[in-house]
């Protein structure tokens, strides 16, 4: 093990004692926000300290087995123990490296997924519907709940724009991530190549959608919106093709005047619920704008493999004639497109997470 990594790990036992003491204090227990924060850190530190203790134990086992080699009667058993210990030590070191990677505090949060039809007209809107269905199906496979926050339907099906809220327990995504941590690398441009249902000559068309994944702010993170900065419009909710689905102005559009960011909702039964949902999405969009601006600055300094998550980044191609999905950021190609569109997205999400981990390990000099 590299000395840098070992020195980092040595601190965890001491930090665990400090956290145990803090959690026993009455003033900490009385402050729920601080107590939750310390409890979260305690769980993370306990995991690292436990795995490092196991690593040290196996190091001691290995040293003992090597001493046993000098005894002819014990040599065979010693060789078996050496092989087992060396194998486990490699696995433990890899696990410890990943546990020490910087954590995105938003990874455990629920997420909003915003899908917009781009170039390609009706076919793009249909593909936006396919993407919404893919994420909804994937969410169902891991036990997450999906709620449509707003939807602007196309006349022939699909969506011009749709916003989904996905809720799930922390640690239920690939590699133990939460909802946002699992889906955040979906942000960017998604291109589809296929023969549209309306195409009579059998020609392949190319169209595109953009996806933005935003963490849902919790009550402590949520920004305070000044009512003076908001313009709230109400209008009649309508379905595809402009058919009115009610006769009251229950749909709500909220404009954040300083940034020009807009959110609207017309899916709820009342103006009150639509306004609440629109404000939720608006807050997430404002925070995402700030986050993406920070990420763009960081990306200018460090060209990351996964990218900044900007909408303009073309990240993936879905080629239906070939049954192929290609993620251009990590040169991943899978020939199981129909299964992926039915929600079998885990392999793609995990590959992206592993690529990001490899980037971080390289930055820390651990690879």
Swiss-Prot record:
Q: Where mainly found?
A: cytoplasm
Q: Output the Gene Ontology terms for molecular function.
A: translation release factor activity, codon specific
Which residues constitute the signal peptide according to the record?
none
Q: Which UniProt keywords apply?
A: Cytoplasm, Methylation, Protein biosynthesis
Please report a single Pfam family linked to this protein: PCRF
SUPFAM superfamilies cross-referenced by the UniProt entry: Release factor (SSF75620)
Q: How is it modified after translation?
A: Methylated by PrmC. Methylation increases the termination efficiency of RF1.
Compartments, as annotated in UniProt: Cytoplasm
Task of the protein: Peptide chain release factor 1 directs the termination of translation in response to the peptide chain termination codons UAG and UAA.
* Entry protein name: Peptide chain release factor 1
Organism, by scientific name, is: Acidovorax ebreus (strain TPSY)
Please name the gene that encodes this protein: prfA
């Amino acid at each position: 093990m590299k000395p840098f990594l070992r020195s980092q790990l040595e601190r965890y036992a001491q930090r665990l004692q400090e956290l145990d003491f803090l959690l026993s204090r009455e003033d900490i227990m009385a402050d729920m926000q601080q107590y939750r924060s310390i409890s979260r850190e305690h769980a993370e530190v306990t995991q690292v300290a436990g795995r490092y203790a196991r690593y040290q134990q196996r190091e001691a086992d290995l040293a003992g087995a090597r001493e046993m080699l000098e005894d002819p009667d014990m040599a065979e058993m010693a060789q078996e123990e050496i092989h087992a210990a060396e194998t486990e030590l490699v696995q433990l070191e890899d696990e410890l490296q990943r546990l020490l990677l910087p954590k995105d505090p938003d990874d455990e949060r629920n997420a909003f997924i915003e899908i917009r039809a781009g170039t390609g007209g009706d076919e793009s809107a249909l593909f936006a519907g396919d993407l919404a269905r893919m994420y909804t199906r994937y969410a169902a496979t891991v036990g997450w709940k999906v709620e449509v926050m707003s939807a602007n339907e196309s006349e022939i099906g699909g969506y011009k724009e749709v916003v989904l809220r996905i809720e799930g327990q922390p640690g239920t995504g690939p590699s133990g991530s939460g909802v946002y941590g699992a889906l955040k690398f979906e942000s960017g441009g998604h291109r589809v190549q296929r023969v549209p249902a309306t195409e009579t000559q059998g020609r392949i068309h190319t169209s595109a959608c953009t996806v933005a994944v935003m963490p849902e702010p919790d009550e402590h993170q949520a920004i305070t919106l000044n009512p003076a900065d908001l313009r709230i419009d109400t209008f009649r909710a309508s379905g595809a093709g402009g058919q009115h689905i009610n006769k009251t102005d229950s749909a709500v559009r909220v404009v954040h005047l300083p940034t020009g960011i807009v959110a609207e909702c017309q899916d709820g039964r009342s103006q009150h619920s639509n306004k609440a949902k629109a404000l939720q999405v608006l807050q997430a969009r404002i925070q995402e704008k700030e986050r993406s601006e920070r990420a763009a600055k960081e990306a200018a300094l460090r060209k990351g493999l996964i990218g900044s998550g900007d909408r303009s980044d073309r990240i993936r191609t879905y080629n239906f004639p070939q049954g192929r999905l290609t993620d251009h950021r990590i040169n991943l190609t899978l020939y199981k497109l129909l299964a992926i569109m039915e929600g079998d997205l885990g392999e793609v999400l995990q590959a992206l997470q592993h690529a990001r981990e490899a980037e971080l390990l390289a930055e820390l000099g651990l690879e």
